[in-house]
Amino acid sequence: VLNTGSPITVPVGRVGLTGLTVAEHFRFTQANSEVSALLGRIPSAVGYQPTLATDLGGLQER
C-alpha cells in the first residue's frame, strides 16, 4: 500500500494492473486497425475500427 499523504491509501498492485489492462485494450484496438489496413480494408475515414465505440464502451462498463 502506497501512502500518498492523503487520507486514502492506494494499493500499488491494483494501480499497476489497471494501467496494464488499459494499455492492452488499446494495443488490441490498434492491432485490429493494422490488420484491416494490411487486408486492404479502410475501417473509416479516420482510421479507427467501426466497433471502436462498442469495444471501449465494454471496457468502461467494467
From Swiss-Prot:
Reaction(s) catalysed (UniProt annotation): ATP + H2O + 4 H(+)(in) = ADP + phosphate + 5 H(+)(out)
Keyword annotations: ATP synthesis, ATP-binding, CF(1), Hydrogen ion transport, Ion transport, Membrane, Mitochondrion, Mitochondrion inner membrane, Nucleotide-binding, Translocase, Transport
InterPro entries reported in the protein's UniProt record: ATPase_alpha/beta_chains, ATPase_F1/V1/A1_a/bsu_nucl-bd, P-loop_NTPase
One cellular component (GO) term of this entry: mitochondrial inner membrane
Subcellular location: Mitochondrion; Mitochondrion inner membrane
The EC number(s) this enzyme carries: 7.1.2.2
One GO MF term: proton-transporting ATP synthase activity, rotational mechanism
Induction: By E.ampelina infection.
Enzyme class: translocase
Gene3D superfamilies on file: 3.40.50.12240
Disulfide bonds: none
Similarity section: Belongs to the ATPase alpha/beta chains family.
Quaternary structure note: F-type ATPases have 2 components, CF(1) - the catalytic core - and CF(0) - the membrane proton channel. CF(1) has five subunits: alpha(3), beta(3), gamma(1), delta(1), epsilon(1). CF(0) has three main subunits: a, b and c.
Function: Mitochondrial membrane ATP synthase (F(1)F(0) ATP synthase or Complex V) produces ATP from ADP in the presence of a proton gradient across the membrane which is generated by electron transport complexes of the respiratory chain. F-type ATPases consist of two structural domains, F(1) - containing the extramembraneous catalytic core, and F(0) - containing the membrane proton channel, linked together by a central stalk and a peripheral stalk. During catalysis, ATP synthesis in the catalytic domain of F(1) is coupled via a rotary mechanism of the central stalk subunits to proton translocation.
Name of the molecule in the record: ATP synthase subunit beta, mitochondrial
